[in-house]
Amino acid sequence: MAMRKILVDETNRELCEHGTVGFPMTVNHDDLWAFEGKSVPIHWHNDLEISLPKEGEAIYQVYQKSYTVRPGDVLLLNRNVPHSCHSPNNSHARYSTFLARPDFIYGEYGSDVERRCFRPFLQNSSVPCILLTSGNSCTRTVIQKLNETEDLFDQKTFCYELKIKGLLCEIFGMILCEHQNDLAKFVPANQLELERLEQMLNYLNTHFESIISLQELADQIHLSREVCCRLFKKMTGKTITGYLEEYRVNQSLPLVQSCQYSMIQIADMTGFSNASRFARAFHRQFGCNPGEYNSLKLQKC
């Protein structure tokens, strides 16, 4: 079975369009074990995202904070927010993901719905996500309506598009009203920080095969090395070294799976200084050595 992969550009912006031009929303039935490395690497997109756990635990990294979501919880991710996802101890985690373009829900930009209801969330850097926890009556109602939305999307009966839009308006109305006090603490989104992160990710992803110095990276965004490190950590929750190691290991997967190269060759092709460092980094991420990866993967199919 082919492993799923989030397709991104050099800045880690997701390339996949969610839904269609005429109906810009979709529902994915996700399983972390179906993704390469049993995790979703850091990425971001312009759409709103809701995660509805079905089985197991998933840990979302949003900026510097981790959110553990379980069945009975709901996580709403704001647009343009870098995020990643993994499960503790590589355990199974199944969840449904709802993705929608914001204007599909609020309609015309500048309308009262966009300006009064959505703008305090969409342009608020202090609310990158909203976690609805189990045991709350609002959460239970939201889950019920998300399940209705999922059923309609899967069955695609007559007028399912209209019914889904109505349900999404109800869902977002409940979530935003429930967190009205949080939205009142408005901090305008810092577009410059996102642009600088894009520049750093672009440089790291383009030059991962080479030795990259922190000074080189800092020079790309005209900041000191210290500020560069703080900004990267703030926006991704990861250190630059940790991100680069993870990215290099992910880039090594197709080479490992091809069985055409030695560990020394793969280490050299993916920017590791030697095979031992590559093997250790691979083991940290996947829990096995590169040589064991293919056989273990076959056993679990």
Where are these regions (language model features)?
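Ligand-binding loop in jelly-roll beta-barrel domains
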Residues: 80-103, 110-113
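Hydrophobic/aromatic-rich alpha-helical bundle segments in the mid-to-C-terminal region
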Residues: 157-159, 163, 182-190
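Linker/hinge segments immediately adjacent to helix-turn-helix/homeobox DNA-binding domains
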Residues: 169-185
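Solvent-exposed, amphipathic alpha-helical segments
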Residues: 56, 138-155, 196-207, 251, ...
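Basic/polar phosphate-binding segments, predominantly the helix-turn-helix DNA-binding elements
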Residues: 174-179, 199-249, 261, 265-296
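Generic protein-terminus/edge-of-domain signal
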Residues: 1-74, 80-81, 89, 114-116, ...
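Amphipathic alpha-helical segments enriched in hydrophobic/aromatic residues interleaved with Lys/Arg
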Residues: 114-167, 202
